[in-house]
UniProtKB/Swiss-Prot annotation:
Pfam families: ATP-synt_B. HAMAP family: ATP_synth_b_bprime (MF_01398). GO terms for cellular component: plasma membrane; proton-transporting ATP synthase complex. The chain crosses the membrane at residues 4-24. It comes from Cereibacter sphaeroides (strain ATCC 17025 / ATH 2.4.3) (Rhodobacter sphaeroides). This is ATP synthase subunit b 1. Keywords: ATP synthesis, Cell inner membrane, Cell membrane, CF(0), Hydrogen ion transport, Ion transport, Membrane, Transmembrane, Transmembrane helix, Transport.
């Protein structure tokens, strides 16, 4: 406070450069200087500089607390941003894993479908081959039966033309003896 008073007194020193008696009530410079000093004295007496300093100190404390709060908010925002970035990376990785899994499953399903198709084709081929073999066996059997029928008919025609009743009777007797010999 003393420094402020000395500064105010020194600030009034240019008024001393005026002409004429300085300490006269007719000198406006003296009146202005006197009014300024009285005003400064009233301010000092009313403790205005202390109040101003107190207000400035409170404002400085308030600004410091706001700065600390801003720092805390900035750190919290950084933490939230880092958390968001991590979660975004995790989601992207999970999406990539899901896509890869779906691709693998689709590929496995396609391979399974190919294998099932090959197995179905193999079964159908085997069934067709079995049907062909069965048809061949049936055809061979039918041809044999037909050949046997034709051979029996031809043999009976040949035997009927060549055999006499006495030879037929002798052949029947011989066949009966042969059957009896085989059963006994």
């Amino acid at each position: 406070m003393k420094k402020l008073s000395i500064l105010a007194a020194l600030a009034a020193s240019p008024a001393m450069a005026a002409t004429g008696p300085f300490f006269s009530l007719s000198n406006t410079n003296f009146i202005v200087t006197l009014a300024f000093l009285i005003f400064m004295g009233i301010l000092v007496y009313a403790k205005v500089p202390g109040r101003i300093l107190g207000m400035l100190d409170r404002r400085a404390v308030q600004i410091r607390s706001e700065l600390e709060e801003a720092r805390a908010l900035r750190e919290e925002a950084r933490t939230i941003l880092a958390s968001y970035d991590r979660k975004q990376k995790e989601v992207q990785e999970q999406a990539a894993r899901i896509v890869a899994s779906a691709r693998d499953e689709a590929q496995a399903a396609a391979e399974q479908a190919k294998a099932d198709l090959k197995a179905s084709i193999a079964r159908r081929l085997a069934a067709a081959e079995d049907q062909i073999a069965s048809a061949e066996a049936g055809a061979v059997r039918a041809i044999r039966e037909q050949a046997i029928s034709v051979a029996v008919a031809a043999a009976s025609d040949v035997l009927a033309r060549q055999m006499t009743p006495a030879a037929t009777s002798a052949s029947i007797d011989e066949s009966i003896k042969e059957v009896e010999a085989r059963f006994h």
